[in-house]
A protein has these predicted regions:
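Conserved active-site-adjacent core of cysteine acyl-enzyme catalytic domains
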Residues: 2-29, 44-230
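Acidic carboxylate-rich catalytic motifs and surrounding loops in phosphoryl-/glycosyl-chemistry enzymes
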Residues: 34-39, 104-108
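Noncatalytic regulatory segments and standalone regulatory/sensor domains
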Residues: 159-162, 166-169, 173-174, 186-313
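Accessory, solvent-exposed terminal regions and/or long lumenal/extracellular loops of proteins
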Residues: 245-411, 418, 425
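Hydrophobic, glycine-enriched assembly/anchoring segments
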Residues: 418-442
Length: 442
């Protein structure tokens, strides 16, 4: 079963991109341009920007190994899970545009696939979430599958983790799950047809799809179908609501979004602790081994530049949104604030380069190889699998090398973290100024 004529592939911000692609497939256009919606506009309608930061410490499977600390940053407003929670990003965007959502949650993969087939038969693509990397030991069915057939998974084993998506082999620390559109489920050929951030389509076998979708039990094999109106009539209100969400959550004394730290003050908190050698959550304390430092710096770079972003920690995309909003709301003053966010995006990109600097050959090579992987994946998808695997293996090799001997001395590392702290502080001040200007204008 396949949705005929579906050819909308590729995303940057995955949630906004999935909605854009389905609206485009359904023939729904933005009323102010009479062209397909842009990702930037949809992202802004959903609340735009966020500022979440966490460092998590995990006990490894092997008790003889030290606890693992991992860095997490989120730059978009609220979480991009697919569920019934109206405060999640996808329902928020859809509700503001008058798009009806049908959400199916079930613990049964068979019932989930029945919903998928029924939706595809009626001409509706289905949005779902797939795990990318997970520990093979964390779920019994994963371990059993791996024992039966190690070749079921792609070639990379990364720090006791396996990749569930054969086409996605970029190392684990950078991404955990993908929001995807399923537009085909063909039982005779044992294929699931889906989209990703690449501009090319992808395929999984049905067992690969079932395992990847079901590995995180709380997601409940969720499938989601959009039923948009033929015409969007409330764009003005949707844009204003999105800007209000962004400003209020980032400038509020305490986060107005339950369970998430979304305040711009987050960046100032990082600036104060990152290079502090006595701080409990300082990076010198948390990430004190070569592999931890490498994972942290590469993850910081990836999340700013290409994981769910096309650079600038989504601030560049928000600049594009404000440019569109100035036309929709008839407020040309928004263009000036858009320019502020464009400059902030450049500041974030500079920070991402600072994390993997040119004057340290191994870190520079990791940065350039990750950029190469991302460009290949975006443009060529599965057709570039050999080159994608080679790039991923190169990053693995660099990680192994720096785990033995990190290329920066303690003094050089302290200097690097101090420079990064300064950049976080400068970003904090710049974002606060831009957000206050936005609040005063609207």
């Amino acid at each position: 079963m396949k949705v005929e004529g579906f050819s909308q592939f590729g995303t940057t911000e995955r949630t906004a991109g999935a909605i854009r692609n389905i609206l485009d497939y359904e023939g729904v256009v933005a009323p102010h341009t009479r062209e397909p919606f842009t990702e930037a506009l949809l992202m802004g309608i959903g609340g735009g920007l966020g500022a979440e930061y966490a460092t998590w410490a995990f006990t490894p499977i092997d008790p003889s190994r030290p606890r693992k600390a991992k860095l997490y940053l989120r730059f978009h407003h609220v979480k991009n899970y697919i569920d019934k929670n109206e405060e999640s990003l996808l329902p928020k965007i859809a509700n503001r545009l008058g798009v009806t959502l049908t959400v199916k949650e079930t613990a049964s993969k068979d019932r989930a696939n029945e919903f998928l087939l029924e939706s595809l038969k009626s001409g509706k693509p289905v949005i779902t979430s797939l795990s990318v990397w997970h520990s093979q030991y964390m779920r019994r069915e994963v371990k059993e599958q791996y024992i039966q057939d190690p070749n079921f998974f792609p070639l990379l084993l990364y720090d006791e983790h396996v990749s569930f998506l054969p086409y996605f082999t970029l190392p684990y620390p950078w991404i955990n799950h993908n929001l995807t559109i399923i537009y085909g489920f063909e039982e005779e050929s044992n294929q699931v047809l889906l989209t990703d951030s690449s501009t090319k389509p992808h395929t999984l076998t049905i067992p690969q799809f079932n395992l990847s979708r079901g590995i995180i039990k709380s997601r409940k094999n969720t499938g989601l179908v959009l039923d948009p109106p033929s015409k969007i009539t409330n764009l003005h209100q949707a844009v204003r609501a999105g800007i209000h969400d962004c400003v209020e959550s980032l400038l509020h004394e305490k986060s107005v979004v339950s369970g998430a730290n979304l305040r711009v003050e987050t960046w100032n908190a990082i600036a104060k602790t990152l290079a502090n050698p006595t701080a409990k959550r300082g990076w010198l304390t948390l990430f004190n081994e070569g592999w931890q430092l490498f994972d942290t710096l590469t993850r910081l770079h990836a999340q700013i530049t290409f994981h769910n972003s096309d650079g600038g920690a989504l601030r560049s995309s928000y600049s594009d949104f404000l440019q569109e909003a100035s036309d929709i709301l008839k407020k040309p003053q928004l263009c000036k604030i858009a320019n502020q966010f464009a400059n902030i995006g450049i500041m974030w990109d500079d920070l991402s380069v600072e994390a993997l600097p040119d004057d340290t050959p191994q870190l520079q090579a990791a940065r350039r190889t990750a950029q190469e992987w991302n460009a290949l994946f975006k443009i060529h998808g599965e057709a570039a699998k050999k080159r994608l695997d080679a790039a991923a293996m190169k990053i693995q090799t660099i990680r192994a090398e720096v785990s033995e001997t990190f290329p920066l001395t303690e003094k050089e590392l302290i200097a690097l973290f101090q420079d990064m702290s300064t950049r976080f502080a400068e970003i904090y001040e710049a974002e606060k100024i831009a957000l206050k200007a936005l609040k005063n204008l609207l």
